Amino acid sequence: GDKLILTKPLGAGIINTAIKADLVSERAREAVLKSMKTLNKYACEILKKYTIHACTDITGFGLGGHGTEMAAGSDKTLVIDSQALPIFPDVEEYASMGLIPGGAYRNREFAAKTGYVSTAKLWLEDLVFDPQTSGGLLAAVPAEEADEILGELKELSLPCAVIGEVIDRKKHTLLIR
């Protein structure tokens, strides 16, 4: 099956909630602002050189919402490795403080309609459903091309990662491990 590549860190919604609560660290604020200013066109230019079976930008519906749509539209299941997710600084701390935006709960409800299963820690599950502002691209690419794509993306200093894989459709559209 295909590998899933994510081109930007997750946690923008959680950090923005921490900003509103005046609890954010300077390093988290700077990291999220830098990411929001980084256009997806640079990652897109690299991805276009390869075989891309599906691609979407991760915005208000979060990785979980957009991933659910991608999986349902292709009659597949996405397996997300929560330990592989690129994450902004201090997100675990803010999530454990309950600084989760309301959109994350709505995104989780949306994904529950088509079905998801999670064995991940709660804060990582919250992160999967965290709405992103100017989030990265989620691309489904052939496994044999994933390392080369990742190498090119990292040459541009894009904080990307292989975060999971696409498998034949199971009962649920999204499995978060």
Where are these regions (language model features)?
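Helix-biased detector of long, well-ordered alpha-helical tracts
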Residues: 2-177
